[in-house]
Amino acid sequence: WEDGRNILFKSSPVLNSHFEKEMNVLRDARLTRIGPGTDTKEVLVWNAQLVAAFIEVCQVFGRKEDLQSALDLITAIETHFNKGDQWLHQAQFSREPIGAFLDDFSALALAYIKLYLLTSDSTFKEKANKLLILICDEFAHPELALYQYRSKKADYLIAEKVEVMDSVMPSSNSILCEAFLWMGILKNKAEYTLNGRAMLSQILERAIAHPAYFANWLRIYSEWIEHPKALLKYAGDGEGLAGFDWCIDKDQLVCIPSDEIETYLLCVGDYCFAPVSTLQEVDKQLAELI
């Protein structure tokens, strides 16, 4: 029976011709299937995270076109996802508009923050601050330091829940936690910093026990608490910062534009050095950390 049939004894030309015939049968059968529908949803959180992605690419490669893509997209978001005084979860809807959820607001606030850090345009910082005020008013949980997924103004048919587990997308609360920590620095507002730290403390034990489900939380904890980078606030246009020869790796120093100081202010974690007026003095302060 095996004579001429066992594939181990067939020559390559014969075997390949049989294989092509079988593939054609499978291909013809596949073409008869109904194709899947195309997902054309335009969702606020996805677009806001793409803004942040464009900014990160710009920071890595230094391409101005990536920054322009981020600016164009944030303009489109403000045009299509904002109707009057309401932010929308989706740009298009069938009957009634769907109000934005916590992940939409959190991702948009963080996108504004990253735009401010890159452009020094204080308009973005104020827009982020306005969103955080709204979140505190409409999404705060009555008992936890975390925030509910839906607004208090939302349809009560939507289940109340607190989303904390990171998956393909970072959880809404972890994104918000990072936004609070950034805005605590940018606005010199201790309340925001305390909010972010309280959120971390409520999740940390679970995150350590199940790290695969809390990846973004653990990244934030590492970058902000366990191994914080040096944060340098500067006034003006930051002339001389880019080319200065620091005593530490540039990746460990984050330069932050500020319209609230007139000198340089270096902070690491909870500690801030005395304000100084030259980069050389900042470098001496950094040397004390080594």
How would you label these PLM feature ranges?
Residues 1-290:
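Glycan-recognition and catalytic cores of secretory/periplasmic carbohydrate-active enzymes
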